Amino acid sequence: MRNKQAQWAVLKRLLSYLKPYSLLTFLALAFLLATTVIKSVIPLVASHFIDQFLNNLNQLAVTVLLAYYGLYILQTIVQYVGNLLFARVSYSIVRDIRRDAFANMEKLGMSYFDKTPAGSIVSRLTNDTETISDMFSGILSSFISAVFIFVTTLYTMLVLDYRLTALVLLFLPLIFLLVNLYRKKSIKVIEKTRSLLSDINSKLAENIEGIRIIQAFNQEKRLQEEFDEINQEHLVYANRSVALDSLFLRPAMSLLKLLGYAVLMAYFGYRGLYLGITAGTMYAFIQYINRLFDPLIEVTQNFSTLQTSMVSAGRVFALIDESNYEPVQENGQFKIQEGNIRFEHVSFSYDGEHQILDDISFTVNKGETIAFVGHTGSGKSSIINVLMRFYEFQSGRVLLDGVDIREYSQEELRKNIGLVLQDPFLYHGTIKSNIAMYQDISDDQVKAAAEFVDADSFIQDLPLGYDAPVSERGSSFSTGQRQLLAFARTVASQPKILILDEATANIDSETEALVQNSLAKMRQGRTTIAIAHRLSTIQDANCIYVLDKGRIIESGTHEELLALGGTYYKMYSLQAGALS
């Protein structure tokens, strides 16, 4: 954003969003031009009154005065309508930009979200787009208005007296020099200020998400200090921006305007009578200097907001242009019929350097359950990420019903895989909408899904039943209740493949019995892959795979692995000892 070419590219792209609103923009510009013309005529009427009627008041003088005030009223009305039209165009464009940014964000792969703080993304979709709105609603209209006013005022001044106009024009190079100097000085400061604001949002989001852990480990003071450090740095750069505005904007421009008055008055006093310059003409010129300088002062003041808008637009367009998408699917016509899964020598790395999965091979068919166990970082969840196509694997093959997983459309793949996570996510809405997940299913189907996983009993105990409100992340429900709702959501979607990513890890022993009963029913007739921390929950699996550093080091049934006396045996013994 620091070179002119990049800034022009951003501006050109911003202006391209005007295309769908060409008619509305044309009307706004027409009202803006009408306002400018009226503003240019008003000093002429005043000049005529001073020269012709100041010492000779009559009926015509009253008519001229009424015309003078009538023009002011008309200017106010026309300007108001023009501002409304510009505001409508502005908010429509911001809606479109925000929609494009959100649409692209939804298509991005998990790797983008792994490396990009949530607060930074939120900042781009909220703060930065609002700044763009300021540009279209205020800055763009003021820039165009300044051009209209400059041209019409300059023409009128030349018609009135070319000599006085020449004197005024001597100040224009100084004005443009001042504006250019401000632009160069401010861009770096503004970029840094916006970046720090994004950091503040990221830090806030992180602290709000982890407030329980922060308080549990007495980390309030440390995180307060970290936040204060970023906040203080933002204050420093914000003050620098204000200092630049205070120096280069209104004070300097106002000084030039006053200097213009002085030169004009001196010239009028020295040569005015000799050259036949009337008092009315002089009054008109003073008004025109105001009309010439005031828009330029406003434009210069808006340069700060313009620079901020350009930086913000660059950040939003970076999100719109982000191409770190989910792995590519062929959008083929294949349909998942059974849900049989086969991994053939699959290797995977998140960063292309450190191998997370190394030569993984296994098979699981409809009606079977397999489980993956291992220490943290062994690669269990990475297998799920590969199967869900959240990430692209580097080598090997993944087959579904004998067809390469890449040959299925993303929609076909996702609708046939039911994913239940360790920490179930509930959306703001109702219990019904969370189970249905906005699919076109009936209330009876929602209730049947809840009954199937034994969630109906606690739902019916709620005052509003299935219409009971769900707060953000479902914080008003217990962990077990949230998990049962997640199970009901999965059953309602009727997937052929079920993935359980430590689905019972956070549930107490009493609730676990209820959940295990629900899981047993869910697994019937489905291909099931379970990632387990509690080994007691996967003892009935058809095959258990033990992972270590991305490789399968043991496999077999629960009894076979215990008899082997290897890693699984040690893990099971440790858990059994802890329980006893």
Region roles according to the model:
Residues M1-K39, A46, L54-A67, G82-F86, ...:
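Membrane-integrated ABC transporters
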Residues K12, L23-L44, H48, V64, ...:
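Alpha-helical segments in transporter systems
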Residues P20, L24-V37, V45-H48, Y68-L71, ...:
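Transmembrane helices of ABC transporter permease
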Residues L71-S90, S137, S141-F148, L169-T193, ...:
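Alpha-helical transmembrane segments of multi-pass membrane proteins
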Residues V10, L18, F86, V94, ...:
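Juxtamembrane loop-to-helix connectors within ABC transporter transmembrane domains
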Residues P20, M110-S111, N127-F136, L140, ...:
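An intracellular "coupling" helix at the cytosolic face of ABC transporter transmembrane type-1 domains
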Residues L57, V64, T156-L170, L244-G314, ...:
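Helix-loop-helix
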Residues A262, V328-Q329, F334-S580:
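ABC-type nucleotide-binding domain
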